[in-house]
Curated annotation (Swiss-Prot):
Record has Transport as a keyword: no
InterPro entries: RNA_pol_sigma-70_dom, RNA_pol_sigma70, RNA_pol_sigma70_r1_2, RNA_pol_sigma70_r2, RNA_pol_sigma70_r3, RNA_pol_sigma70_r4, RNA_pol_sigma_r2, RNA_pol_sigma_r3/r4-like
Position of sequence motif Polymerase core binding: 124-137
GO biological process terms, semicolon-separated: DNA-templated transcription initiation
Domain of life assignment: Bacteria
Matching Pfam families: Sigma70_r1_2, Sigma70_r2, Sigma70_r3, Sigma70_r4
Known DNA-binding region: 294-313
Record SUPFAM superfamilies: Sigma2 domain of RNA polymerase sigma factors, Sigma3 and sigma4 domains of RNA polymerase sigma factors
Record protein name field: RNA polymerase principal sigma factor HrdD
Keyword Transcription set for record: yes
GO molecular function terms listed in the Swiss-Prot or TrEMBL record: DNA binding; sigma factor activity
Family to which this protein belongs: Belongs to the sigma-70 factor family.
Sequence segments annotated as region (Disordered): 1-21
Length: 332
């Protein structure tokens, strides 16, 4: 997997040669080649149907339970199995987990590609998403009745967006840029004190014998904090502020357990009008496991993205209210 990169591309140093630019371009081509190789590799693993997901989940569950017996967390007398049999169950569970993960790696790529403006290479996003997928496999409860792809998408997205947010907090400037930024800031302060306003890039450049473009590059690179309104996904639906942790929010798992139990959700959605029900099903991939963007749903229904967003928000509040009234949320 590619080495983690900083969240923004570093501006070229003054006087950068064409050779340096060629090296960067070659690196970008190499990254694309690696992505292609990775996609070819994971495409060899067949997708799972619902029955196979249940079978693998049961094998994983048995392996976890056997491991607890071996570790003394569960009374071994109640198991009725030898140590060798328990160790075999643990090994089978690990193999099942590996198959489950490898069969869903394409889902990670699909989610990672939604964040082309994140500033992170696609391979890094995939690596973070894979960690979310592993967590989803470990936490998935097949007995709840909801689709694994829908459940896993929450964990994959959480891992990716958290990584994007973390990267923004750990951006570090090279020494030469720190010094250059210091000179720019000094000119800004002096100019503001003398003129009562902030200087334009051209005015700063004149003081430093630089160029307006160079000043803009350095300021853009060093800007902190990143604009909370900066779009990071392909559809403009996720802004940087959406990635910052909300400690008061329920976890993705809690949200899924509350809203995505298939039988209960069908009952609740059945109480919505046809258009709203269709929008919710498309947005969350309830019927086919593929989540649609606001734009896709809007085109399907002849509505704007903003109108779809409003309908979705109202519908989720209504579903939450109905779940509370019927006691579904209490059972989650």
């Amino acid at each position: 997997m590619a080495t983690r990169a900083v969240a923004r591309r570093q501006p070229a140093a003054s006087g950068e040669t064409g050779a340096a630019g060629s090296v960067r371009a070659t690196g970008e081509i190499a990254d694309r080649d690696l992505v292609g190789m990775y996609l070819d590799e994971i495409a060899r693993t067949p997708l799972l149907d619902a029955a196979k997901e249940v079978e693998l989940s049961q094998t994983i569950e048995a392996g976890v339970y056997a491991g607890k017996i071996l570790d003394g967390e569960v009374d071994s007398d109640s198991a009725g199995a030898s140590r060798e049999e328990l160790e075999a169950l643990v090994a089978e569970g690990e193999r099942a987990k590996d198959v489950f993960i490898r069969s869903n790696l394409r889902l990670v790529v699909a989610v990672a590609r939604r964040y082309p403006r994140s500033g992170l290479p696609l391979l890094d996003l995939i690596q973070e998403g894979n960690a979310g997928l592993v967590r989803a496999v470990e936490k998935f409860d097949y007995a709840k009745g909801f689709k694994f792809s829908t459940y896993a998408t929450w964990w994959i997205r959480q891992a990716i967006t958290r990584s994007i947010a973390d990267q923004s907090r750990t951006i570090r400037l090279p020494v030469h840029l720190v010094e250059e930024l210091g000179r720019i800031r000094r000119v800004q302060r002096e100019f503001n004190r003398e003129n009562g306003r902030d200087p334009e890039p051209a005015e700063i450049a004149a003081e430093l014998s630089s160029t307006p473009e160079r000043v803009t590059d350095v300021l853009d690179w060093a800007r902190d904090p990143v604009s909370l309104n900066m779009s990071v996904d392909d559809e403009g639906e996720t802004q940087f502020g959406d990635l910052l942790e909300d400690t008061s929010a329920v976890s993705p798992e809690q949200s899924v357990l509350t809203l995505l139990r298939s039988e209960e959700l069908d009952d609740l959605i059945g109480q919505l009008d046809d258009r709203t029900a269709s929008i919710i099903k498309m947005r969350y991939g309830i019927e086919d496991g593929r989540e649609r963007t606001l734009t896709e749903v809007g085109k399907q229904h002849g509505l704007t993205r903003e109108r779809i967003r409003q309908i979705e928000k109202h519908a989720l509040l209504e579903l939450k209210r109905m779940a509370h009234d019927t006691g579904f949320d209490a059972a989650a």
